[in-house]
Amino acid sequence: MDTLTAIGRWLAKQHVVTWCVHHEGELWCANAFYLFDAQNVALYLLTDDKTRHAQMSGACAPVAGTVNGQPKTVARIRGVQFKGEIRRLEGQESDAVRKAYLRRFPVARVLPAPVWEIRLDEIKFTDNTLGFGKKLHWLRDSRAQQA
């Protein structure tokens, strides 16, 4: 199994992302439920334009973040660190993603918040189930590495 496939399978099983944005010398983090898109290597989420992180992001901004499970033992730790770009989706692109998002999270139907995409450009996946401290690396230009 290639690196991106392994990372993607794990991301598809999770549902909460933490991401951080930077604007004018200020950092801010947020959490949200996400939908993983393996084809585009992206996370989709809903967040209101009035939130601090959305206002700091504007229409598009660099982003970094994490996705991690909550294992009870060190040997089962798995998690992703990433960097990429967050952008607010509009029009038909937003509508199509919203439909898929609502299939995964039906409760979100009550949220009129816009859809955002986090395009993942670099991923580091720690997977202790493959051995303590095992890391898989992926870059958008398709160069994958193992450490």
Curated annotation (Swiss-Prot):
Membrane-spanning ranges: none
InterPro entries: Split_barrel_FMN-bd, UPF0306
Superkingdom, taxonomy of origin: Bacteria
HAMAP family, sorted: UPF0306
Family (UniProt): Belongs to the UPF0306 family.
Identification of the protein by name: UPF0306 protein YhbP
Native organism: Salmonella paratyphi C (strain RKS4594)
